[in-house]
Design a protein with these regions (language model features):
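Conserved active-site beta-strand element of glycosyltransferases/polysaccharide synthases
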Residues: 112
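Flexible, glycine/small-residue-enriched loop-and-beta-strand segment within the central core
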Residues: 4-16, 21-89, 115-116, 122-124, ...
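Acidic/histidine-enriched, glycine/proline-rich intrinsically disordered or flexible terminal extensions
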Residues: 130-146
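Short beta-to-alpha loop/turn elements within the nucleotide-binding domains of ABC transporters
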Residues: 88, 99-100, 106, 115
Length: 146
């Protein structure tokens, strides 16, 4: 499910798995391939950038642009206003906190956040019923989803 507006360079370089969901104002610069696994969720204003430009102004001003692919594993939630930079691989079962700038690979089962984005801790079975700030899913809801 894509909540408009949605922006991309080409669209032909974007591959999504089952149950993909992005909130409004997603921006994917797909000059290189972008791959999302199954059950990925993107918050509002998430930007996925495969495109880059040279550092030196003489080279940059020539119009040269390059692209590096981005891979996002299964069961990933990328929080609102986050940016994923060229060449990054985000593992499976990962949560990226809101307002993060992901410049390096993030391993499976990680909770990561910040600018630059860093792993805060691993996600474990102890987290199965946790919500925001260690609140737990109440029993009535757990009976339905658990």
């Amino acid at each position: 499910m894509i909540t408009p507006p949605f922006y991309c360079d080409y669209g032909s370089n974007i591959e999504v798995g089952k149950n993909f969901m992005t909130n409004y104002n997603c921006n994917i610069l797909d000059v290189a391939k972008v791959t999302f696994g199954d059950n990925c969720m993107l918050g509002p204003n998430v930007a996925i950038y495969t495109a880059g430009h040279p550092l030196h102004p003489k080279t940059r001003n020539s119009g040269y642009e390059y692209g590096k692919p981005i891979v996002v594993g299964d069961n990933v939630w990328i929080g609102g206003n986050s940016v994923v930079c060229p060449g990054v691989h985000i593992g499976s079962n990962v949560v990226i906190g809101a307002d993060s700038v992901v410049t390096k690979d993030i391993p499976d089962w990680s909770l990561a956040a910040g600018n630059p984005c860093k792993v805060i801790r691993l996600i474990t079975e102890d987290d199965i019923r946790k919500l925001f700030r260690n609140e737990e899913i109440d029993d009535d809801v757990w009976k339905i989803i658990g």
